[in-house]
Amino acid sequence: MKNVTDSFVFLGHWPSAGSFGFNTDILATNPINLSVVLGVLIFFGKGVLSDLLDNRKQRILNTIRNSEELRDGAIEQLEKARARLRKVEMEAEQFRVNGYSEIEREKWNLINSTSKTLEQLENYKNETIQFEQQRAINQVRQRVFQQALQGAIGTLNSCLSNELHLRTINANIGMFGAMKEITD
């Protein structure tokens, strides 16, 4: 770059008597010199500037393509995430409904088993009461029978004397003897 500017400086120091030269003083330049300088800059700088702009354009296009690919990937991931969310929400709803119905079913099972258990306990209680009543009745009967028996024995012992006792035995023996003769 320095060689190019040096050549312009040397061109500016050429003798100006009747020859064509570059005036490096910008304020003293005329439109022809300016147009020549601009023409040279455009001619030589056009390729460099065009390459720079093409490179910049390619980078921008690549960035846009990458951004679009990333956006498409993000949209695809978003759709997948939404689909997973819908699936999870449906499963959660299904679990909630199943859970409520399962809880309701368990509640009714528990109520039914509890009522059956209470019914069985009531039956056991009634059976126990009947058993105890029957046992009490049997004990009372046994005591009444024992008391009646003791009373009868006491009455018989007090009423029967030995003589009456012997007569009763003889009468019974006679009846047995008569019955034996009839059966023979």
Curated annotation (Swiss-Prot):
It is found in: Plastid, Chloroplast thylakoid membrane. One of its GO terms (molecular function) is proton-transporting ATP synthase activity, rotational mechanism. The chain crosses the membrane at residues 27-49. It is a single-pass membrane protein. GO terms for cellular component: chloroplast thylakoid membrane; proton-transporting ATP synthase complex. It holds the Pfam family ATP-synt_B. Keywords: ATP synthesis, CF(0), Chloroplast, Hydrogen ion transport, Ion transport, Membrane, Plastid, Thylakoid, Transmembrane, Transmembrane helix, Transport. Its main location: plastid. Belongs to the ATPase B chain family. F(1)F(0) ATP synthase produces ATP from ADP in the presence of a proton or sodium gradient. F-type ATPases consist of two structural domains, F(1) containing the extramembraneous catalytic core and F(0) containing the membrane proton channel, linked together by a central stalk and a peripheral stalk. During catalysis, ATP synthesis in the catalytic domain of F(1) is coupled via a rotary mechanism of the central stalk subunits to proton translocation. In plastids the F-type ATPase is also known as CF(1)CF(0). F-type ATPases have 2 components, F(1) - the catalytic core - and F(0) - the membrane proton channel. F(1) has five subunits: alpha(3), beta(3), gamma(1), delta(1), epsilon(1). F(0) has four main subunits: a(1), b(1), b'(1) and c(10-14). The alpha and beta chains form an alternating ring which encloses part of the gamma chain. F(1) is attached to F(0) by a central stalk formed by the gamma and epsilon chains, while a peripheral stalk is formed by the delta, b and b' chains. HAMAP family: ATP_synth_b_bprime (MF_01398). This is ATP synthase subunit b, chloroplastic. It comes from Carica papaya. The gene is atpF.
